[in-house]
Amino acid sequence: MPLMSQARSLGKYFLLLDNMLVVLGFFVVFPLISIRFVDDLGWAALLVGIALGLRQFIQQGLGIFGGAIADRFGAKPMIITGMLLRASGFVFMAIADEPWLLWLSCALSGLGGTLFDPPRTALVIKLIRPQERGRFYSLLMMQDSAGAVIGALIGSWLLQYDFEIVCWTGAVIFVLAAALNAWLLPAYRISTVKTPILEGLTRVIRDRRFLMYVLTLTGYYMLAVQVLLMLPIMVNEIAGTPSAVKWMYAIEAALSLTLLYPIARWSEKRFRLEQRLMAGLFIMSVSMFPIGMTTELQTLLMLICLFYIGSIIAEPARETLSASLADARARGSYMGFSRLGLALGGAIGYSGGGWLFDTGHALNQPELPWFMLGTIGFLTLAALYWQFNQRRIEPAMLGGH
């Protein structure tokens, strides 16, 4: 077997193992943050939303710098350092009894993600052939869903003993992931050339089409991040027990494991990437409107099911579309910048969603945040339609050295 083919084959298995640990470590802790601090300790949802939004904004908003540094120095040192930083964030979260401590822990967690996320994404592009990426992203999403359920189940079980144990468990998993990367990951260069940091940044910023696409996705992410904030709070409120949150993630896992790969295989032969992205976003947006008026757990879970179906359709297409638009000479920079929409959408979605949730309850209008989210989804859909109705999707190749 040629050396590159062997590297690709082994690389797939390593990427899947690494991804499983990262997803597991994240979902042991993060789905329980809103339950712990809002429902158990009685903090305002806005305070917790700021913490979650801060993590999202730091991780994704600074991702272009993490990606540019990885373009220059390689993936391995950035990934290991980032994972250890996230572990330290979870340690601080274990002792958080004031908002500033929670914010600090989320900031450290986000900074860790800034360092390890772009090079990990760029490794997928490097090791997976273009014609196989859509299916591989679907496999990663299926794994994400299974890992989310297993992580949430472990976290929910540990929460009955102590939230500190939950956080320490997440920290140990990320230390293990860092050790695995230190031991097994070769010193890959993730770009086709050793791009200087400023050149990689400049190349992305000059790509107006990619810039517009990334910023448009802000609205998409404002909906997507509610899986970690308002949806768990809503499930807990209606069910009356935090243990019900695991059913939300069980639904996601069941749908992903049964539908995600078949839908991706079927749709990639019949529809363009942007059409699949917009169809998924449409379903996600429609599911938002009735949630605030729901009083039965069964109805809420059905709406969450609809939301997840939209996500299953949209997410592989979004990831593949981002990869197809990236310039191979600065993959890390492109993949880092592609997270800017998630940074903005996450920051606004978490803090704005938390504020709207508190305001809706204070005004006795619990449907307010969900109506606003649905509206934002449709506005984003219109922007995507306008953008892709007049542009062909090809990788950017800009001049310069």
UniProtKB/Swiss-Prot annotation:
GO MF, any single term: transmembrane transporter activity
Location(s), subcellular: Cell inner membrane
Keywords in alphabetical order: Cell inner membrane, Cell membrane, Membrane, Transmembrane, Transmembrane helix, Transport
Main location: membrane
Cellular component GO terms held in the UniProt record: plasma membrane
InterPro entries: MFS, MFS_dom, MFS_trans_sf, MFS_Transporters, Multidrug-R_MdtH
Transmembrane segments: 13-33, 34-54, 99-116, 139-159, 165-185, 214-234, 244-264, 273-293, 297-317, 340-360, 368-388
Membrane-topology annotation of the record: Multi-pass membrane protein
Pfam families: MFS_1 (PF07690)
HAMAP family the record matches: MFS_MdtH (MF_01529)
PANTHER family, sorted: MULTIDRUG RESISTANCE PROTEIN MDTH, RESISTANCE PROTEIN MDTM, PUTATIVE-RELATED-RELATED
NCBIfam families: PRK11646.1 (NF008650)
Family affiliation: Belongs to the major facilitator superfamily. DHA1 family. MdtH (TC 2.A.1.2.21) subfamily.
Protein's name according to its UniProt entry: Multidrug resistance protein MdtH
Organism: Pectobacterium carotovorum subsp. carotovorum (strain PC1)
Chain's gene name: mdtH
